[in-house]
């Protein structure tokens, strides 16, 4: 756990047991500590990440690097500290989407709404985690559309609504960053990895470690996995499950779930 982080170590153990774990790889806490010292991703690490990406493409039979004959490979990028720090650090989902791959994803899945909903979510998460643009900027645009159309839920958004929001979200990114939203998936990934490394030292993470007497010197791992989608329709969903009841400690399964949603919706209580 000190090297792979709690999440990475557990994913590796589950894989070794033959459980159905989405394929991926983990960047170690050692790499995080070096990044925090140097403040730059070094060439050897980038080459190792790209090498593992190519293996992931072969494993999933999808393409991250732009082969239009294959379904796009989208990634989740998650922090994974050795000690559990729930909600303290950052996650990015649907990484790899751009103006080209979103159309390919719509074609390969025959689900245009899903593709554009995933793109909308990705732009918001990336902008918040990497560029540190406040989520409220995106939420205001989302709520404006929902109020105008008299929608009760994000899942009521139409394809046209989603395309409009994507353009609005990109404009927010440009207004804050004075540059266009990055289209290159590889650049997206390296920026995301850096952001997760930096999240080890964000104020809420530091406060949490102080309160729980966790060392500030360990760093976080980064878990990169092939996406599994909970927002593909009414037969898809996402949830959180505990092997014990966290309220009273009873030895019973406990959890909650949402249909046609992604993990952040459950954690954030959006619906």
How should these model regions be labeled?
Residues 1-271:
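Nucleotide/phosphate-binding sheet-loop regions of phosphoryl- and nucleotidyl-transfer enzymes
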């Amino acid at each position: 756990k000190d090297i792979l982080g709690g999440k990475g170590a557990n994913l590796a153990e589950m894989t070794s047991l033959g459980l159905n774990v989405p394929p991926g790889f983990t960047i170690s806490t050692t790499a995080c500590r070096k990044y925090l010292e140097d403040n730059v991703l070094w060439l050897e690490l980038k080459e190792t990440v790209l090498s593992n990406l190519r293996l992931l493409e072969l494993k999933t039979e999808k393409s991250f690097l732009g082969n239009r004959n294959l379904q796009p490979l989208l990634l989740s990028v998650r922090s994974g500290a050795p000690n559990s720090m729930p909600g303290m650090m950052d996650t990015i989902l649907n990484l790899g989407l751009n103006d080209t791959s979103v159309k390919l994803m719509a074609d390969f899945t025959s689900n245009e709404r899903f593709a554009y909903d995933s793109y909308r979510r990705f732009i918001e998460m990336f902008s918040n985690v990497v560029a540190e643009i406040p989520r409220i900027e995106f939420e205001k645009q989302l709520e404006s559309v929902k109020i105008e159309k008299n929608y009760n839920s994000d899942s009521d958004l139409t394809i046209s609504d989603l395309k409009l929001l994507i353009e609005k979200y990109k404009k927010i990114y440009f207004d804050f960053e004075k540059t266009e939203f990055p289209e290159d998936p590889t650049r997206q990934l390296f920026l995301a990895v850096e952001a997760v490394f930096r999240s080890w030292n964000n104020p809420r993470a530091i406060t949490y470690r102080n309160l729980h007497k966790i060392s500030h010197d360990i760093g976080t791992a980064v878990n990169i996995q092939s996406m599994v989608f909970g927002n593909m329709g009414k037969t898809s969903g996402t949830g959180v499950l505990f092997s014990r009841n966290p309220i009273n400690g009873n030895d019973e399964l406990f959890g909650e779930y949402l249909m046609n949603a992604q993990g952040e919706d459950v954690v954030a209580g959006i619906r």
